[in-house]
Amino acid sequence: MTERQLRSPYLHIETRGLRSLDEPASVADLARAFAHVLPDDVAFSHLTACALWNLPMPVHGAEPLLHVMRDSDRARIRRAQCQGHRGLELRTVAELESLRVVGHLDTWCDLGELFPAHVSFEDLVSVGDCIVNRWGDDGPEHPELAAVLGRRVRPRGGQTLGRALRAIRYGSRSPMETRTRLMFAKAGFPEPRLNAWVSDSDGGWLLTGDLVWDEKRVVAEYQGSTHFPLAARSQDADRAAVALDHGARLFEVFSEDVFSRGRRRRLLVRVARALDLDLARLTID
């Protein structure tokens, strides 16, 4: 291209030496574009790796940077829209759609470095839940994640990662299910079974609930966007009525019940009463 063509207002200038006709529509598109101007020895890491592995991203939005990492004996990447890191020799690297990406287990540990500025405790548990459910690290202490964390020497965010590791559970099917579970745990509720069967009056299958407290036959169900169409709402209402017919109580949980303090308090009180819990012993906030 000529110098004049390179200065065309129709070209997107992503970074030094990189122009494109179309603005990248995703983190993966941006990473693929940057791969043309980055050294061959780098790998995408931290929140960028999280997005490339299709792991849950921070609920309040990630910083608009590409995280890139290389070995400790190489200069840190310094480039517009990039956050450079070192230490790649201590991590596993995978290839995803021709991109070098830090492994998913190491990525979870690396996210601890971004706590609390860009990643919350709930974010760390959500990513951990996704990893153990997708890759089958279902031991009670999640040995693969624990092993990767154990190999780190005084990692930034290490205490928070250790606490998050103890809160990770096999069986959660979505980030918002994880956040709903953590909401009840923080309030002091007994731990429910995850995505568990609830039986009908004859002992047969009645429904599978997101969070199930067996003793009192109480179920909490997170209702995401797939439950918004009228047909889905009709099905959910019938499901709750059938559950009640068989002596089970089903509580619907929406995002506002998790993130809005007033809605959260009211939901926690309702479920606590259904479980015959002493409100004075709970942290309803």
Over which residues does each language-model region extend?
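Surface segments flanking catalytic/ligand-binding clefts of nucleic-acid enzymes
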Residues: 132-285
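Short gly/ser-rich loop at a beta-strand->alpha-helix junction or flexible surface loop bordering the NTP-binding
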Residues: 1-156, 277-285
